[in-house]
Amino acid sequence: MAIVGLGTDIVEIERIQAHVARAGDKLAKRVLTEAELAIYTGHSQPSRYLAKRFAAKEAAAKALGTGIGRGVSFQHIHIGNNEDGAPTIHFTEGALARLQQLKATVGHISIADEKSYAIATVIIESQ
């Protein structure tokens, strides 16, 4: 296996909170998949959840080498959790096409947050 992509992103949680206060759920609806949006709406800290997902998807898009745009949207990247609570990443549509173009087989993700920031790193491996 070889690493074919690496991406990292950091988000100031307060910036997301301010955006939500100003524009409501507009950003959440643009960034989150339907399943993620369902979690967001019931989450005890929705702005923190959104900041972590935003950072994760930006990191994934950087690892794909496209960024958001150029055929890859936030909606093409789903961030979930396995049964132990560890984050998982799933690619669809344009993100999946780019993953296949890279001949990649797996994506690894790490997400962390502290008082003011959310950070995510994504590694993409090929066979």
Swiss-Prot record:
GO molecular function, one term: magnesium ion binding
Principal EC category: transferase
Cofactor requirement: Mg(2+)
Binding site for Mg(2+): D9, E58
EC number: 2.7.8.7
Keyword line: Cytoplasm, Fatty acid biosynthesis, Fatty acid metabolism, Lipid biosynthesis, Lipid metabolism, Magnesium, Metal-binding, Transferase
GO biological process, one term: fatty acid biosynthetic process
Gene3D superfamilies per record: 4'-phosphopantetheinyl transferase domain
NCBIfam families: acpS, pantethn_trn
InterPro entries: 4-PPantetheinyl_Trfase_dom (IPR008278), 4-PPantetheinyl_Trfase_dom_sf (IPR037143), ACPS (IPR002582), Ppantetheine-prot_Trfase_dom (IPR004568)
Catalysed transformations (reactions): apo-[ACP] + CoA = holo-[ACP] + adenosine 3',5'-bisphosphate + H(+)
GO cellular component: cytoplasm
Protein's cellular compartments: Cytoplasm
Functional note: Transfers the 4'-phosphopantetheine moiety from coenzyme A to a Ser of acyl-carrier-protein.
Entry similarity comment: Belongs to the P-Pant transferase superfamily. AcpS family.
A Pfam family of this chain: ACPS
Name under which the protein is recorded: Holo-[acyl-carrier-protein] synthase
UniProt main location, coarse: cytoplasm
